[in-house]
Amino acid sequence: MELRLYDTLTKEKRTFVPLDANNVRMYVCGPTVYDFAHIGNARPVIVFDVLFRLLRHLYGEAHVKYVRNITDVDDKINDRAARDFPGLPLNEAIREVTEQTGKQFHADVDALGALRPSVEPRATEHIGEMREIIERLVAGGFAYVAEDHVLFSPQAMNAANSTLPRYGALSNRSLDEMVAGARVDVAPYKKGSTDFVLWKPSKPGEPSWPSPAGIAAQGRPGWHIECSAMAWKHLGEYFDIHGGGIDLVFPHHENEVAQTCCAFHRERMANYWMHNGFLQVESEKMSKSLGNFITIHELLADWPGEVLRLNMLKTHYRSPIDWTMKSLEESAKTLDDWYRVAADVDPGRPAASVVEPLLDDLNTSLAIAALHGLRNSDVSALAGSLRLLGFLSESAAQWEDRKQKASGVDAGEVERLISERTAARGRKDFKESDRIRDQLAAMGVAIKDSKEGTTWEFSR
């Protein structure tokens, strides 16, 4: 069975044919490191990690290159640095914010079981590439200088008599309608309401670099040009897959396409565009004002990362996901069972019943349903399939030990209470037996009686 992926540009599933099967290339937009990543940010991390693993499974680990960037120059970073480190020069404060936040991001995504990308470029290390693309755009008549800004003109792109794509094609928008519907105040230096910034002057104390070809003031890049530059540097002018959250389709990805295609006279930037759906919490949009804004770091204090991973993958990546406590509890119970059954088993090849749904536009929901079927039929294939999806990163004993430490429950105390309960049952003191059972339940311990004795585990 061949791999088929839904392409946001063509609005259909397409058979995946790599440009070079020995060098499959994927770019995914990464974090802007100004704050801890929230659970919505975890979705593209997990989704495209599964795709990365699947591509490596199909083409070989040495033949897949995955690039996920880090945006470390941005207004949000500047604002956070000034607020959190008022006693430091702004550049030093920015360094503190980006280093601390970047370190936490890596700790969080490692805990989610995500493989590190092949390359993780930082925007500030690619200013030269950004300047070169901007110079190409100005020379080609697609960008212009105004009041020390350099701006891209979508109108100039669509007016070009060439093989360039139409601005708005990715997001299925009409440029004329965008212009007609513009309701925001347009900066006076812009020629058109849809023109966007490639380069802007920096305020005193902010990070700054010499402008492209000296055509404007010392300043810094706009957000969109950063990803065009990093993708070009590490994957070339045209590559296989570009991914991210659906919120990035417009304007970010639309503008990336415009910049890259106009700079290099290409019909396409990426052969396939993939976007994951939105996430809400307990049927409500996640927001700080509603008090349901949850960071990955906060969730990891209560749940193993693999529980968060499974909870995310139970829903198809393009569908909206409702993040609920009930679903988390169900995911935890499922993983407890998988660890008991398969963690210490030599993994076999991933089962076809799991791989085939993944080949159909990364249908993790059906793949997970197939895992349940393997549990009682082929534990070796179950173990191999779980590892393909990024699960079973530790032994069953390590999993239980970590759960115990997280619970704060003393295993010796549990064993003592179970012995007392066994003695109470032996003397038919069922009232005392029930009291101890309830005490254990309050500690988060579930017990199971059998002919061989009483066993226990942590419940969720």
UniProtKB/Swiss-Prot annotation:
Short sequence motif named 'KMSKS' region, residue ranges: 285-289
Biological process per Gene Ontology, one example term:
cysteinyl-tRNA aminoacylation
Quick one: where is this thing mainly located?
A: cytoplasm
Write out the residue ranges of the motif 'HIGH' region.
31-41
Subcellular localization(s) per the UniProt record: Cytoplasm
Q: Would I find Nucleus among this entry's keywords?
A: no
Q: State how it assembles.
A: Monomer.
The name this protein carries in UniProt is: Cysteine--tRNA ligase
List the source organism: Bradyrhizobium diazoefficiens (strain JCM 10833 / BCRC 13528 / IAM 13628 / NBRC 14792 / USDA 110)
Question: What is the gene name?
Answer: cysS
